[in-house]
Design a protein with these regions (language model features):
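Glycine-rich phosphate-binding active-site loops on the catalytic face of alpha/beta enzymes
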Residues: 102-109, 142-152
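Conserved N-terminal beta1-alpha1 strand-loop-helix module at the mouth
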Residues: 6-105, 112-139
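A short acidic, helix-capping loop that chelates divalent metal ions and anchors anionic groups
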Residues: 53, 90, 147-153
């Protein structure tokens, strides 16, 4: 992750300290919602400083249900909850922010929909995408998976 330039005042919604250990969920490691929530809580208690709920293969209502159960866990430990890709869900549950891919809603529209105080992160796969995200007002950039994951086959 790279933080945007302070002189641009773009990372006012998130601090470098909050980005020390960014967890991205992978439900393939859990057999049930209860097990997933227990694992998420353990990760947060072990030092995760921001948590992205990434549910690529889950129906909206189930995604919402999991997010609503995870939100108080994150709040208890003062860990921002980021919803992957789904701006509507992020607003509906009042999550701390959203992480957008290159094919998702653009940053400006997401910011208008969610509000100026929400965290917006963007995946960038090259310098051009990174600069576009920075100029578009992203609070942080995700630079891709470092390890093989069942949720990111490309």
């Amino acid at each position: 992750m790279r933080f945007l330039l302070p002189e641009r005042s773009l990372y006012m919604n998130i601090t470098p300290k909050q980005m020390l250990l960014y967890a991205v969920s992978d439900r393939a490691w859990s057999n049930s919602d209860e097990e997933f929530l227990s694992q998420a809580k353990q990760a947060i208690k072990s030092g995760v400083t921001i948590f992205q709920l990434r549910e690529k293969h889950t129906e909206y209502e189930h995604f919402r249900e999991i997010a609503l159960k995870l939100k108080p866990i994150c709040k208890q430990y003062n860990v921002p909850l980021i919803i992957n890709d789904n701006v509507k869900l992020a607003k509906e549950i009042d999550a701390d922010g959203v992480h957008l891919g290159q094919d998702d809603l653009d940053i400006k529209a997401a910011r208008e929909y969610l509000g100026a105080d929400k965290i917006i992160g963007v995946s960038a796969h090259n310098v051009k995408e990174a600069l576009e995200a920075e100029n578009g007002g992203a609070d942080y950039l995700g630079s891709g998976a470092a390890f093989v994951t069942s949720t990111k086959t490309d």
